[in-house]
């Protein structure tokens, strides 16, 4: 299982040698992690991770969804159900189930990330199997008790320069405050994620809005609601936030008059919003958030196009983020036009667009980012954060948008130990792509070195204002 130093490089010797040289120049660069889902409490409390299953299996929906698809219950993986049904609590049993089914992950990015962590973090080069499951479990568990495996030590070991968490608009950010108060040098910053108080299609929307205005101390009116967002965005900024994040079902935007927007708010705040009103409210709020970003400087990320909770059985029994979200077709040209008509040429605005619809890369996203100064393309996301997905992304966007209308790499992960693995993968794939351009005489090698550095480090740091 030992990691091959030429993994993800071309099999053609000349191109592979170019990729080796390029990768050597970026391999040790610091990690900028501008968007992700690690827990701020890890850095605040700096406690040991409890066991291998809690570290690698239970929080990783890439892992749990694959096992679930093969007939293994989520309870058997230690996932707690909403109805109180018993779930497995023995970490060793969960690990054995994972190890016995390790073959399911052949050729997946999960295998790349896991084996990178095994070797580079724990020094384990055996391929996981039913036969060695207990031995590897014990080896990992022993190391997890040691000081060098605490979250802050790993932050330094991974050469992380900054990491952003993703946090609800009403989050008090107490763990971010604890990190700051501790005097530790690590840069752990929040990102403003207001979806719960913006998505009028959610059953808890009205209560989330009441919570938002309550925390902000503003009235429950359209203007009070907008002021509450401004208040909370400033609260996040004081704790280092540089971005907001918006996970909407579509990329639809709108630009209603103040009167129409106020009347729409009055309808949806009563609860049970119609489908059309919920969509229009989300659309208007993307435009309002863009307007706020011009005022306060937060970079705006839009992550549209996921059919959330597609499997109602999983959602009803286990809740959100259990691997049952599915990509759907997503349009951008017509949907973003109201926002772009108002703000697309404003140099104070940066909107980073992501997609789960790869067909939109060359048809819509690259042409849009190649024209509007306010737009940038986010990296390959979620299901396409993989060697083939990143390569397709480069091939489909570079000719129209270039490299400098993209923003480098996001690891976008809940799995802390996969952060260096994901950045290693992205740097290797980008270097392999650049090596091909050099070999084809479409790029000079000195230019490729510069682009490789920008993709690995500078673009993320610059775009996210880090």
From Swiss-Prot:
Which keywords does this chain's UniProt record carry?
Isomerase
Q: InterPro entries under this entry?
A: Metal_Hydrolase, Uronate_isomerase
Q: Name one GO molecular function term.
A: glucuronate isomerase activity
Q: Which reaction does it catalyse?
A: D-glucuronate = D-fructuronate; aldehydo-D-galacturonate = keto-D-tagaturonate
SUPFAM superfamilies tied to this protein: Metallo-dependent hydrolases
Q: Which GO terms describe its biological process?
A: D-galacturonate catabolic process; D-glucuronate catabolic process
E.C. number: 5.3.1.12
Q: In which pathway does it act?
A: Carbohydrate metabolism; pentose and glucuronate interconversion
Q: Which NCBIfam families match?
A: PRK02925.1 (NF002794)
Q: Which family does it belong to?
A: Belongs to the metallo-dependent hydrolases superfamily. Uronate isomerase family.
Name of the molecule in the record? Uronate isomerase
Origin species, per record, is Brucella suis (strain ATCC 23445 / NCTC 10510)
Lineage of the source organism? Bacteria, Pseudomonadati, Pseudomonadota, Alphaproteobacteria, Hyphomicrobiales
């Amino acid at each position: 299982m030992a990691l091959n130093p030429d993994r993800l490089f071309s099999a053609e010797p000349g191109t592979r040698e170019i990729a080796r040289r390029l990768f050597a120049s970026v391999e040790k660069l610091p990690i900028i992690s501008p968007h992700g889902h690690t827990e701020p409490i890890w850095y605040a409390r700096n406690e040991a991770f409890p066991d291998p299953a809690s570290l690698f299996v239970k929080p990783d929906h890439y892992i749990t969804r694959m096992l679930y698809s093969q007939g293994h219950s989520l309870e058997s993986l230690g996932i707690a159900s909403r109805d109180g049904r018993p779930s497995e609590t023995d970490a060793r049993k969960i690990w054995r189930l994972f190890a016995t089914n390790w073959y399911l992950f052949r050729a997946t990015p999960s295998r790349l990330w896991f084996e990178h962590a095994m070797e580079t973090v724990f020094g384990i080069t055996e391929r996981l199997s039913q036969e060695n499951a207990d031995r590897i479990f014990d080896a990992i568990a022993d190391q997890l008790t040691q000081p060098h495996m605490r979250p802050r030590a790993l932050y330094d070991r991974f050469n992380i320069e900054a990491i952003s968490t993703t946090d609800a608009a009403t989050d008090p950010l107490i763990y971010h405050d604890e990190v700051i108060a501790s005097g530790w040098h690590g840069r752990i910053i929040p990102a403003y994620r207001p979806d719960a108080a913006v998505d009028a299609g959610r059953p808890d929307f009205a209560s989330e809005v009441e919570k938002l205005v309550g925390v902000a101390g503003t009235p429950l009116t359209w203007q009070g609601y907008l002021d509450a967002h401004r208040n909370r965005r400033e609260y996040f900024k004081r704790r280092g936030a540089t971005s907001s994040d918006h996970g909407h079902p579509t990329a639809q935007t709108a630009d209603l008059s103040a009167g129409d927007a106020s009347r729409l708010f009055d309808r949806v705040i009563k609860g049970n919003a119609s489908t059309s009103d919920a969509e229009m409210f989300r659309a208007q709020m993307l435009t309002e958030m863009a307007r706020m970003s011009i005022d306060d400087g937060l970079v705006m990320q839009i992550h549209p196009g996921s059919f959330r909770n597609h499997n109602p059985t999983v959602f009803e029994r286990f809740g959100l983020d259990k691997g049952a979200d599915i990509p759907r077709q997503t349009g951008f040209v017509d949907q973003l036009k109201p926002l772009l008509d108002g703000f697309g040429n404003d140099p104070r605005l940066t909107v980073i667009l992501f997609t789960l619809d790869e067909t939109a890369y060359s048809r819509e996203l690259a042409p849009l980012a190649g024209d509007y100064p306010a737009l940038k393309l986010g990296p390959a996301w979620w299901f396409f954060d993989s060697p083939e997905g990143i390569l397709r992304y480069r091939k489909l966007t570079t000719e129209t948008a270039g490299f400098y209308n993209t923003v480098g790499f996001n690891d976008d992960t809940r799995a802390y130990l996969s952060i260096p693995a994901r950045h290693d993968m992205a740097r290797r794939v980008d270097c392999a792509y650049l090596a091909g351009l050099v070999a084809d005489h479409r790029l000079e090698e000195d230019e490729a070195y510069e682009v490789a550095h920008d993709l690995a480090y500078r673009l993320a740091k610059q775009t996210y204002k880090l």
